[in-house]
Structures are given as structure tokens and as C-alpha cells.
Amino acid sequence: MADLSSPDGDPTIRTLLRHVLDTADSHTPRRRQSTQTNPQRRRSQTPYSKRQGSQRKTSTRKHSHGTGSVGRLARVQGHGHLEEQTPRTLLQNILLTAPESSTVMPNPVVKPAQVPEVARPSRRGSSRGSLELQLPELDPPSTLAPGLKAPGKRKQKLRLSVFQQEVNQQLPLPQEQRGAADGSSLASSFNLSFVPSVQPQTVDRPGLARRRPVRRPVNIGAFLQNLENKSLTSALPGDSHRTPVAALPTDVVFEDTQPFSQPLAGCSLSVHHSLPNPSQTEVEDAERVVGPRTPSTGTRPQSQMSRAGFGASPLPFSEPQPQSPELREAVGSKEAEEPKDLEGSSGDEETSGMPASRELSSSAQDLLLAEEPHQLFEPPPSPGVAAVSSESVPAKLPSRTRTAQPRHHQDPYKAGLSHYVKLFSFHTKMPVEKAALEMVEKCLDEYFQRLCNDLEVFAAHAGRKTVKPKDLELLMRRQGLVTDQVSLHVLVERYLPLEYRQQLIPCAFRGNSVFPAQ
């Protein structure tokens, strides 16, 4: 006890426990009692309790292996049961696991702070189960190579923050940082990176990188050229009096969007011919012939205004070109023939005093649309300006007129025959073949033809143009259907159904609301 009170001594737990072990008795006083009670316990044990005890022994033996300190404890436990441990064995276990530093006088040397490793607690039961002591089991320092893993050691997990930092730096993860990354949650919370991760310029896996969409620049010149080419191809192939769109300014072509619109004040989109326009009275006669049937009558005042106001203005963007004499003669002959035809048709209409028929109006409309599409909507040329090229641009193409097709009217005679054939198939009350129905239709056709001819002959012989019932009765007498014994009324009652007889018999005797008695 003298060295304990000296100030130079190291009063640690280890020294105190060693002093107790040196002075204490090597045998416990309860050892003898426990040995005496063991036979009694063995007698009271059942096979089930023995089986549980053996299972407990095997589990404790498996748990004791793994480290050096645990191996020492296993040697102590191998001599007896857990219930037979003495205070000496407990103190020896404490000596094996207690730290070397003193709790009263700490070491003056300051060591760098290290991250404490997580200890796995192990519970060991006392002799009676009343004492529970939790002792931490520290893993011994591994002296293995850095590439090899220690037996029974958990796989180290990589922190997300460390991974983000390594991705930003584009550096491989060092071994030192991997060991430090597996620290406590408090130490790893300070390693969080609040700076957004910068995407590296070079990607190791190019297959995961998204491709940028290919944006092709729009070529406005090529777009306008395609529009001009389409307008050239959409023009009529046989029309020689139209100008291509490429010869006109773009703003003039885009501004002229209304159908049959009036030309602009600065330029003229019309065609200049070498011959003068027909007189005003001839055009009015042509309008009177066509009337409201032509769809272009509403634009006639515009064409007249364009002839009056803009006829003398030449084309500012086109140069005069010479024209062949054959073309001039052909155009002149066409223009000379049109007023004559229109004047003749209008004269016939005035002399007759009746509105023009449908055939005359349709023929005049076709004539105007076929031979004068450019004169109805274009101003006349100035006398001092030469004609332009044969191709020119109209203000708007006229709408295509639809020719009225004759309706297919069904012959009422054929419709009546088909009706009687249906009646025949209905009254037979059995299926009839198609060939038999065709034969019935032929017989009905022949019968009705002869009946009509006979009735017409009887009515003409009597000097009448209307067939009367007495003509039918006379014909039926000639055929032998009506005699002096069998009158027409008896024949009706014999062969006609009841619903028809209810309508015909009152009409024959005293009349009804539809056919009153004469």
C-alpha cells in the first residue's frame, strides 16, 4: 500500500487490479457450495434444458473466436461453464481490455486526435443471471498489406461527399482518404460540399453524354427561290400570255393576295396586247348576255376602272420586246370574233324579249372563260407602248366552273314494273328465284304495253283524248273477264283483297270523300 500513496506511482485501474489479484485468495469461498449444488441441478435438469445448455455453449464458443483477446477469454471459459466464473477471471478480463493511460494523472504528451473506432459490445451473463456487464471488444491493429482485407472486417463504404469532391478534382481516390471517409457521422458532416459540382469537360464514357440537337440555319434565299420555282411550275402550260413570278418584285407579288384585286398605282400587272380593246357598248352587251350566272360579274367595274385609270401606265420593271406578226394576227382574230358573237347573242335576246336560255348562258360563259380570261381582269395597253413578252402574271386565276351534269332520272314505267314484281313476290309467300322474277317482269311489260295500246285505241275511236272506265270495261269484255253474268264489281270483289274492296266498292256505288258519286 506504500506505493499506492506515493505521488510517483501510477494509480491506474490496471495497477489497482493487479494489487487485488496479488492479495486475494486464489479460490473463491463459494466454489465448494457451487460444486455441491451442481449434482442437484443435474438431477433437476430435463433433456430439454440440457439441449438448451449445449446450444448455449456452442454459441458462446463461436462468438469468442476472431481476435487475440477473445482467444484468451475462450481459454478461460473452456475450463468451466459461464455460471462458474470467479471475480478473478472477471478482473483478468478487465486487465486485458483496460487502457494503459491513467485516469487521475493523464499523460503530458498531447497526441493527435484520432477518430474513435466503433466498438462492438458483447454481453456476458453472470453466474445467476443477475449481473450484466457490457465490455467493448476492440479489434487488434491489423498488420496486413493495404490491398488485403482483414478476416471478419466489414466492407468500407464510400461517402457521397468524398465521391463528389473526387469527381470535381478528377483525381483517383487515395487510400488515406478512403480510411478517413469511414469516420463517424459527426466528422463526415463537416465534409459536405455546398458548392455545386462542376461538370467535367471530358467525359470518360461518351455514350452517356447527350448529343446536342443539330440546328440547321434557314437559308432565306433558297426558300424564296423554291417559292418562285413552285409558282413557275403551277402556271398553266398552254397559256402564253402570262409572266413568271421571278420577273416581278417580291413585295408586289406578296401584296397582291385578294382575288381579282385592283392593280397598284405604281405598277401594272396586266398584259399589254398590240390591238386595242373592244368598245364599251360591246362589253356591256356581253355582261348583259352572261347576267348573274357568271361568277366574275362582280369584278367587271374593277376591270373598267383599271382600264380607265391605269391603262396608260407602262410596266416599270419590264422592257418592251418585239412580238411576231403571226402571234399578233392570232390574238387580233380572237379579239375580233368575241365582240361579234356577244353582240349577236345580245341582239337575239333583245328581239325575243325573253330571258336567255340555260344553254345560251352556259355557252356564252364558256366562251368568255375560254377566250377572254385576260381581258376581263386586265386594263388595255397604251397605244404608244409595245407589247411585252408572251408570259405575264395575272392578278388572280378565275375559279374553275363546274359543268352541270344531267341527273339520272329513273323511268317511271320501269319503277312501276319493279313495284308489281315486288307485289308478286310478296303474295306468293314463298321464295322466288331471280330468273322467275325476270320472267314475271317481262310478262307484265308485255301485258301493260298491250293494255295501254288497246285503251288508247278505244279512246281514239270514241273521239276522246282521255281514257275512261268504260274503255277499260269494254276491253275487259273483249278479253272475256267481264260478262253479263260477272260484272266489274263482282270481279273486283272476287280478285281484290278486302282493304282494296273497302275503298273501291263504295266508290263504284255511291262514292266517298275521295271519289264522289256522279
Curated annotation (Swiss-Prot):
Stated role: Component of the CENPA-NAC (nucleosome-associated) complex, a complex that plays a central role in assembly of kinetochore proteins, mitotic progression and chromosome segregation. The CENPA-NAC complex recruits the CENPA-CAD (nucleosome distal) complex and may be involved in incorporation of newly synthesized CENPA into centromeres. Part of a nucleosome-associated complex that binds specifically to histone H3-containing nucleosomes at the centromere, as opposed to nucleosomes containing CENPA.
Modified residues (Phosphothreonine): T86
Keyword annotations from UniProtKB, A to Z: Cell cycle, Cell division, Centromere, Chromosome, DNA-binding, Kinetochore, Mitosis, Nucleus, Phosphoprotein
Polar residues bias: start-end ranges: 34-57, 294-306
Entry protein name: Centromere protein T
Oligomeric and partner information: Component of the CENPA-CAD complex, composed of CENPI, CENPK, CENPL, CENPO, CENPP, CENPQ, CENPR and CENPS. The CENPA-CAD complex is probably recruited on centromeres by the CENPA-NAC complex, at least composed of CENPA, CENPC, CENPH, CENPM, CENPN, CENPT and CENPU. Identified in a centromeric complex containing histones H2A, H2B, H3 and H4, and at least CENPA, CENPB, CENPC, CENPT, CENPN, HJURP, SUPT16H, SSRP1 and RSF1. Interacts (via N-terminus) with the NDC80 complex.
One example of a Gene Ontology biological process annotation: mitotic cell cycle
Keyword flag Cell cycle: yes
Keyword Transmembrane attributed: no
The organism of origin for this protein: Rattus norvegicus (Rat)
UniProt cross-references to CDD domains, sorted A to Z: HFD_CENP-T (cd22920)
Stretches the record annotates as Disordered: 1-70, 102-156, 271-362, 375-412
Location (main, coarse): nucleus
Similarity remark: Belongs to the CENP-T/CNN1 family.
Modified positions (Phosphoserine) in chain numbering: S313, S324, S333, S345, S346, S357, S382
Superkingdom of origin: Eukaryota
Record comment regarding domains: The largest part of the sequence forms an elongated and flexible stalk structure that is connected to a C-terminal globular domain with a histone-type fold.
UniProt-annotated stretches for the region Flexible stalk domain: 94-381
Cellular component terms (Gene Ontology): chromosome, centromeric region; inner kinetochore; kinetochore; nucleus
Ranges annotated as biased composition (Basic and acidic residues): 19-28, 326-343
Start-end of Low complexity biased regions: 384-395
Protein's cellular compartments: Nucleus; Chromosome, Centromere; Chromosome, Centromere, Kinetochore
